[in-house]
Amino acid sequence: MAFKPIRNLLVARKRKKSGLPPGTLVYTGSVDSGETRIVTVDYGVESHQVTETIMPIAPNTGNSRWVSVTKINDIGVIKKLGQDYNIDDLYLEDILNTHQRPKIEFSDNVIFVCLQHLYRGRETKALTSEQVSLILTPSGIIS
């Protein structure tokens, strides 16, 4: 039985952030084509509303909210999301560093989860990893 190649799992990790202070926002993943996409789902007791944008929508207080962000290579959008939702820069730094080891951190009213999603590519069938970060708050989730 032959083993399929494994991409992005054993890749030499480049140090793009050497010498920078903690909380500095630097994207360490591969440059992905396309722009950052944000899907916001507001859940109420009897309804929900889905909104797709390229910039974060300000937090609301009435409903629970799920904010799903894809293609995180635009640091400006991630920084704005952090400002709007009061996310600590250290969490944003961990989100942008796509070579994080799986971890979970607890702080005041926030649970931060970082993990690796493994999947097989469609064309090459190679095993690939992708970082998934979750920020759980009393009013919703950001992924």
What are these regions (language model features)?
Residues 1-143:
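Peripheral, non-transmembrane regulatory/ligand-interaction domains of membrane transport proteins
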